[in-house]
């Protein structure tokens, strides 16, 4: 099994390799494949039931598992979810490695992995993983207000 310290730079290098061989569109196709095979089974099931509230339930679990420094809010009266990643462990690790040049759109995989699934179930993307520099980003969705299952 590969450790996360090895996986993250390998993932970044893979994106670079795919783009050099087949172009940027091939990288996006790769991300779509990852979305369908790995992200959809978890996020899709939650979003089908909870709509925009799935954002809270999904990321409150996954971001804590990754030990990310983040702040997120969800208003179950207005259906507005907002998140600020103050420090993404993946991007941060890449930026700290002196021997690695991060793939130029490394953070782009988040836009492709998550927003399309949430939008299928009524969440509207207001800010799709806008990179803010220094391993941070912001994203926001709104939709029909529903309570979260794991407050």
Can you say where each PLM-predicted feature lies in the sequence?
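Short amphipathic alpha-helical segments
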Residues: 113-114
């Amino acid at each position: 099994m590969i450790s996360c310290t090895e996986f993250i730079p390998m993932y970044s290098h893979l994106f670079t390799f795919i783009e050099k061989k087949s172009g940027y569109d091939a990288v996006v196709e790769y991300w779509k494949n990852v979305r369908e095979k790995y992200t959809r089974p978890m996020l899709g099931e939650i979003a089908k039931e909870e709509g925009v509230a799935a954002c809270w339930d999904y990321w409150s679990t996954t971001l804590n598992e990754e030990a990310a420094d983040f702040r997120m809010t969800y208003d179950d009266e207005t259906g507005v979810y907002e998140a600020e990643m103050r420090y993404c462990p993946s991007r941060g690790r890449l930026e700290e490695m002196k021997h690695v040049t991060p793939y130029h759109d490394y953070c782009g995989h988040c836009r492709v992995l998550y927003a399309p699934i949430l939008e299928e179930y009524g969440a509207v993307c207001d800010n799709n993983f806008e990179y803010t520099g220094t391993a941070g980003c912001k994203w926001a969705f709104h939709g029909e207000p529903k309570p979260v299952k794991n407050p």
